[in-house]
């Protein structure tokens, strides 16, 4: 029996799961809307709700806690400068999950997770994999 266990394991180690949710949180803060599988979206919601609640109180301690969770300095800045003030008067429920059909290939249920009152212009194309520029000998 799995009574009292919260969350899913997603067939990943604890470190991998934490890194996955950190990356998904950073992507959601950056684009304000992402498409993922429904179970991942359901488990991401409490993570992002707690981060937005941290963003509502701008303090050094809150910034350090957010940085420990997200690990992306630019997204922490956006969290405290844009998202925190936007949801200052809202007591909770900062994001919504909408079902988006099934993925072709493995028929996994997909979902769109987005911020309530989101900025439509913030959603952009995926930046793709980042590469390190190498210094060429001139």
Swiss-Prot record:
Keywords: Ribonucleoprotein, Ribosomal protein. GO terms for molecular function: structural constituent of ribosome. One of its GO terms (biological process) is translation. The keyword Ribonucleoprotein applies. Gene3D superfamilies: Ribosomal protein L17 (3.90.1030.10). It holds the Pfam family Ribosomal_L17. It comes from the Bacteria. One of its GO terms (cellular component) is cytosolic large ribosomal subunit. The keyword Ribosomal protein applies. Belongs to the bacterial ribosomal protein bL17 family. Part of the 50S ribosomal subunit. Contacts protein L32. This is Large ribosomal subunit protein bL17. It comes from Methylorubrum extorquens (strain PA1) (Methylobacterium extorquens). The gene is rplQ.
